[in-house]
Amino acid sequence: MKRFLKAWRKTSLIKKITIGVVIGLFLGILVPKASAIGLLGQLFVGGLKAIAPLLVFTLVISALSQHREGGKTNMSTIIGLYITATFAAALIAVVVNYIFPLTLILKTPAKTDLLPPKGISEVFQSLLLKIVDNPIHAITEANYMSILFWAVIFGLAMRSSNQRTKDLMQTFADATSQVVKWIINLAPIGIMGLVFTSISENGIGILGDYGLLILVLVGTMLFVALVVNPIIAFVMMRKNPYPLVLRCLKDSGITAFFTRSSAANIPVNMRLCEDLGLDKDTYSVSIPLGAAINMAGAAITINILTLAAVNTLGITVDFPTAFLLSVVAAVSACGASGVTGGSLLLIPVACSLFGISNDVAMQVVGVGFIVGVIQDSCETALNSSTDVLFTAVAEKSVFGKK
């Protein structure tokens, strides 16, 4: 037993997670009614979601309060990369539609009581109102835009504090980070539970009716992750980007795929940034910000499903209109964190460009919820892994260096 525990401790986290995935897969097929196994996944995701807001709040305050005057954080570059990648992903989705035009079977009403926003202005109004939320309420509700806003305010205010106060804040941040490490070490067990739940509840029948749609969605996201993002990274770094790209997909994308939550993956991304030796002053802000606005996967989902609806209804779309759709999708995707239901509930906003009624648009949303088990997992993996990727790319960029 001791030999087994020793070997387990020496095994890398990714290998442990792989073992957990395989065990969860078999248990989901063999004993699908053993619901207690699924509880392990819920506890793992719940733990990550619970600690992530506190982690972001303490890290940002600590980093800003001790930030050196004249220190470079690369935040403008990172935000520029987030926006560029999101728009590029939306544009790629349009091109994919011309190559693989999809149609949908719009006969199942959307099984959701959520109401879509009436337009982009409503999306950003909601986002702005969330920013000025009560800071305590923001932490309890995991409202990261508000958490970031108040953490920045408190961090700047604490710059004039004495060193002992700053050290105390750093101690809180370090203690929170240690708790995060303990939770992440439970990832193999948690992901085993998540895989079990997914297999036992959904099976693999979903691949039959919506196989082509799933293939196009996943294929487009893979193309963006393995081709588009590396091109952007190469332009910025002027060196082979794939070791960094694959490291981010392996260490961040895999956990994000199973948790299906960018918020829950924030602690994982923070740890990866630390392992990559990135500047803490930068990544403590860029990672939670990326979880809120870096939404390449959401832009792909919005465009693919919207254009599939357009094809189904026989509406002709010229490229200038499709380009405008890319702009709308990119802007809407950046506000996805401000909308209950995320990217799927923003589809009616995009559909409105083509005069598609809200009833039809909500049927498209219904299709999105049906394939959401796979679509949402891949979308989150792409979104979350690129938070780390572009934070690292900005720091390693050849631009702005003497």
Curated annotation (Swiss-Prot):
Domain of life: Bacteria
Location relative to the cell: Cell membrane
Entry-linked InterPro entries: Na-dicarboxylate_symporter (IPR001991), Na:dicarbo_symporter_sf (IPR036458), Ser_Thr_transp_SstT (IPR023025)
Repressor recorded as keyword: no
Any Pfam family matching the protein: SDF
TM spans (from-to): 19-39, 43-63, 86-106, 138-158, 179-199, 212-232, 287-307, 327-347, 354-374
Keywords: Amino-acid transport, Cell membrane, Membrane, Symport, Transmembrane, Transmembrane helix, Transport
GO biological process, one term: threonine transport
Record GO cellular component, one term: plasma membrane
Chief location category: membrane
Protein topology in the membrane: Multi-pass membrane protein
Reaction catalysis annotation: L-serine(in) + Na(+)(in) = L-serine(out) + Na(+)(out); L-threonine(in) + Na(+)(in) = L-threonine(out) + Na(+)(out)
Signal peptide: none
MF-aspect GO terms: neutral L-amino acid:sodium symporter activity
Keyword Cell membrane: yes
UniProt xrefs under HAMAP family: Ser_Thr_transp_SstT
Family: Belongs to the dicarboxylate/amino acid:cation symporter (DAACS) (TC 2.A.23) family.
Cited function: Involved in the import of serine and threonine into the cell, with the concomitant import of sodium (symport system).
Name of the featured protein: Serine/threonine transporter SstT
UniProt organism field: Streptococcus agalactiae serotype V (strain ATCC BAA-611 / 2603 V/R)
Encoding gene per record: sstT
